[in-house]
Amino acid sequence: PWAAKIAKALTLEKNKNNPPKTTIQLAELVSRTIPRRFHKNGFHPATRTFQALRIAVNRELQELELLLSSLSKNMLKGSRLAVISFHSLEDRLVKQTFRNWSQPCQCPPDLPYCICGLKPLGKVLTKRPCIAGQDEIENNLRSRSARLRVFEFARKTGD
């Protein structure tokens, strides 16, 4: 919800010939832009801004999509694919991909039976994502956002 305000603040600073030159300056600008009452305890207000920049620069979602597409064409029967995601955009992509692999039918829902002929590649083994327990989070703070999903291929793919 703050992207437009942050972008406007960056533009104003740029127009004043004073754009942020360091990550600390950018973090301070973001912190000033987001009202204090919206600062979450334990998280710097600029955390999501840096995350968004990293995701965009590294093309993380496109790369994950490419990887999943490639893997779906090269798996052996009985093989399992485990994916750990670290933010909701990645997790949503993995969840939707696994669902499409396990329920590929594209027939209209009002048809009494499937006529498209698409067969499932396998099944999702994790109904809900596995998350780190409290002990793991205490020992490894980064694990707090990790989500594990597993898919088992029921047939050889790529044929």
Task: Specify the residue positions occupied by each region the protein language model found.
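S-adenosyl-L-methionine-dependent methyltransferase catalytic core, i.e., the SAM/SAH-binding region
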Residues: 1-159
